[in-house]
Amino acid sequence: MLKNIYVTPLNLLKSATSLQQQVRTTFVLKRKYDPPLHKTNEKPRRMRAKNFIYELVDDTLVKKRPNIEVVLKTFVEGVGDKGDVVSMKPHFVYNKLLLPGLAAYNTPENVAKYAKTEAEKSTVKHSSPYAQRTVNMLETIVLAVVMNKDEPWVLEPWHIKASLRKTGFYCREECITLPKERIEGPDLKKENKDFYCTVTINKLEQARLKCRLHHWSTDPSERLPYVLEHWKLQSEPLLDVCSPEKTP
């Protein structure tokens, strides 16, 4: 008798064949033609085909979503420092801040929890959210320092300042620290040779800037051949010239 009993297999742990996910699409519509009126307590009149024509009022799928406020748990480059309350786009907040655990939602509890302590306030590691980004950009470029081929010169901070201005960076001469050894010319042996200088940002961050010497003449017949994309080529360090030491 027990052999005739049909045993139903359990599929409790069986994986689903398709992914069912909620779709957040809401459309606000309005009728183009109003439906016909009917008297009270009477059967509504039959609507015609034109009464089922709708006009789109609002599409929430393409509607811009408001920014989300979060509290940063640590320093985030280009965003802010620990304890700062920032308001940014939802897509960036979810993928770059909340999922990696760099921020939490803006609540009074989280603001008090992730606020800076007195010891952290006294120790300043970053002068601004964008200072480290500037350091990274300066350390990835090869700065072309164009010097005169006909007249004698001595490399000074304002030469580096002018070369940086050509590439879109603006800084003061006091922020530039040249190597200890004197660099003077013109000297074609130093053509396309590299040396390093230090750029100080907001009197805190320091960037190690790679520079490359080029000689230029106002006389077209005396000019050196043009080198295409010189920063991609390998070069030798400038003889007896070392990079300046970073101040602690």
UniProtKB/Swiss-Prot annotation:
Transit peptide residues according to the UniProt entry: 1-25
Question: What domain of life does the native source organism fall in?
Answer: Eukaryota
What species was this sequence derived from?
Drosophila melanogaster (Fruit fly)
* Complexes and interactors: Component of the mitochondrial ribosome large subunit (39S) which comprises a 16S rRNA and about 50 distinct proteins.
Coiled-coil residues are none
Which GO molecular function annotation, any one, does this entry have?
structural constituent of ribosome
Keyword terms of this UniProt record:
Mitochondrion, Ribonucleoprotein, Ribosomal protein, Transit peptide
Q: Where in the cell is it found?
A: Mitochondrion
Similarity annotation: Belongs to the bacterial ribosomal protein bL9 family.
GO cellular component, as recorded:
mitochondrial large ribosomal subunit; mitochondrion
Q: Which GO terms describe its biological process?
A: mitochondrial translation; translation
List the protein's name: Large ribosomal subunit protein bL9m
| Main subcellular location of this protein, as a coarse class | mitochondrion
Mitochondrion as a keyword of this entry, yes or no, is yes
Output the InterPro entries linked to this UniProt entry. Answer: Ribosomal_bL9, Ribosomal_bL9/RNase_H1_N, Ribosomal_bL9_N, Ribosomal_bL9_N_sf
